Amino acid sequence: GGPEVSFHAEKILAQYTQLTGIMVGEGEETFTQLVRFYHAPKGQLQDIPGLVLPQGRTQPRELTDMSKLPFLYEDLGKFQNRIIYYESQRGCPFRCAYCLSAIDKSVRLRDIETVKKELQYFLDHKVSQVKFIDRTFNCNAAHALAIWRYLLENDNGVTNFHFEIAADLMTEEELEVLKQMRPGLIQLEIGVQSTNEQTLHAINRYMSLEHLRQVVDKIHSFHNIHQHLDLIAGLPY
């Protein structure tokens, strides 16, 4: 499974005839059903949604309800001295031409009270770093503010939280919360991709570079948050 095979599944199955099938789309439920099938075979592979088999595609898998996904870190001993990857939302509202996240036309949030409970678990265990893999963490300002305020109010003095954000979406309210953070509590990865307006237009990345610059400068002036800016090599123009 995965993006490398999901979009040319039939071609890959024809090329690699030793494969039984390919998982396409979101894999949590599909993989779970596959494990159960091979552990105690019942029914047929064709009954499992989200597969491409030599005989054809099974039923499409519905998008995952983020609030129903289990918490995977109850045994933190397995992850000692490792980065914890955490997802509080899935999808992205933008349509950037280079990004797979643009395919999912919805943003699905994990229940905020569940998120707070799970973040508190990390805080209680003083893990070194939690890296949010939300594609654009602050695309929903209320969701982002709720999490940032919770971390501000429950900081354990140790744990660092990493977020990927769109700086041009930042509000004054969000910036005011970030200004109060302990140095090292959070770090920000900011997607810029290109400073060429023609390039941004060609890849459907619509934003105000001037506003982005102002936000980055303002966060820099706080002297409490490490930020790094992403650029993509090889884009047009």
Locate predicted features:
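Short beta-strand/loop segments at the ligand-binding rim of alpha/beta enzyme cores
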Residues: 1, 226-227
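Acidic/polar loop patches that form or flank catalytic/metal-binding clefts of enzymes
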Residues: 44-46, 160, 227
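Radical SAM [4Fe-4S] cluster-binding motif and immediate context
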Residues: 70-225, 233-235
